[in-house]
Curated annotation (Swiss-Prot):
Family from the record: Belongs to the NnrD/CARKD family.
Binding site for (6S)-NADPHX: A40, G103, H152, D219
InterPro entries recorded: Carbohydrate_kinase_pred_CS, CARKD, Ribokinase-like
EC number(s) on file: 4.2.1.136
SUPFAM superfamilies: Ribokinase-like (SSF53613)
Database matches in NCBIfam families: yjeF_cterm
Organism expressing this protein natively: Streptococcus pneumoniae (strain ATCC BAA-255 / R6)
Binding positions (AMP): G218
Gene Ontology MF terms in the entry: ADP-dependent NAD(P)H-hydrate dehydratase activity; ATP binding; NAD(P)HX epimerase activity
Alphabetized UniProt keyword annotations: ATP-binding, Lyase, NAD, NADP, Nucleotide-binding
Protein name (database record): ADP-dependent (S)-NAD(P)H-hydrate dehydratase
CDD domains the UniProt entry points to: YXKO-related
Length: 290
């Protein structure tokens, strides 16, 4: 088991070059938020923008776009029902987040199939929420892209066949051998673990708690992961995912000192400040971020 420490945080979250531009920080495509789950993709997009993603485009229900833009005018948006525009956006994206607030229905399944078929090896796909449920119940072939899965315990049960009470280190390690080599798994739970298929070791969070048990927490984490994946390329993909996952719970833990429950959107709002502290290599107290 590996622990995420201050050294790793500072390796991943670095100061930006003065000569950089938005194209250096990731072209993200976020897909989801179908009725009645529109808020999920909004929270994911908020997290991605707040952690510094260069360009964020959201595909969602047309009726959800005004709500998205009222919260986040920085994001571009289009209707998921526009198949041609979806195809064009998939071709442009470097990172695709599929599934926050995606309904488990025929439309959702068609979307998952189109995304899986359309991605290339040099793209990164994060599968979350409803897309995980669809993946678990269908016999779809894995896409050629780099794959990141973010299941909670019940979703992991559906994907792996391992019941919640048997989800241990050895069973997860064994189940990962069925996924493409290099697949990153964020196994969410009371002690979240981050794995990469082909490696025997894993990261385990030492932060977080029951104050995170509220709707939208996973959507925000997925957006944070997407944002980190699109930038910080001096670190490995595995390290970027691990640090994003850690920071999500670490911020929640800090906010819980004054709040009975921590709202996902509050984590996103606090994110730029904490990232600034880390990239300036200012030491932070161990009980807050590490």
């Amino acid at each position: 088991m590996k622990v995420i420490n201050q050294t790793l945080l500072e390796k991943v979250i670095i100061e930006r070059s003065r000569s950089s531009h938005k194209g250096d920080y990731g072209r993200l495509l976020l897909l989801g938020g179908t009725y009645p789950y529109g808020g999920a993709i909004i929270m994911a997009a908020l997290a991605a923008v707040k952690n510094g993603a260069g360009l964020v485009t959201v595909g969602t229900d047309r009726e959800n776009i005004p709500a998205l833009h009222s919260h986040l005018p920085e994001a571009m948006a289009f209707a998921l029902q526009d198949k041609q525009l979806l195809k064009e956006q998939l071709e442009k994206a470097e990172v695709v987040l599929l599934g926050p607030g995606l309904g488990d229905n025929a439309f959702g399944e068609d979307l998952v199939k189109q995304v899986f078929a359309g991605l290339k090896q040099n793209q990164i796909l994060i599968v979350d929420g409803g897309a995980l449920t669809i993946l678990a119940r269908t016999s779809l072939s894995f896409p050629s892209s780099q794959l990141i899965l973010t299941p909670h315990q019940k979703e992991w049960e559906k994907l792996s066949g391992i019941t919640i009470e048997k989800q241990k280190e050895d069973t997860t390690a064994s189940a990962l051998t069925s996924f493409p080599k290099g697949t990153i798994l964020v196994e969410k739970g009371p002690a979240t673990r981050v794995w990469q298929a082909g490696q025997s070791d894993y990261y385990q969070l030492q932060v977080g708690g029951p104050y995170q048990a509220t709707g939208g927490m996973g959507d925000t984490l997925a957006g944070m992961i997407a944002g980190f994946v699109g930038q910080f390329r001096q670190a490995s993909l595995y390290e970027r995912v691990a640090v994003a996952t850690h920071l999500h719970s670490a911020i929640a833990q800090e906010l819980s000192q004054e709040n009975y429950v921590v709202l996902p959107t509050e984590i996103s709002r606090y994110l730029p400040k904490i990232m600034k502290i880390i990239c300036q290599q200012e030491r932070v107290s161990k009980d807050k971020l590490v």
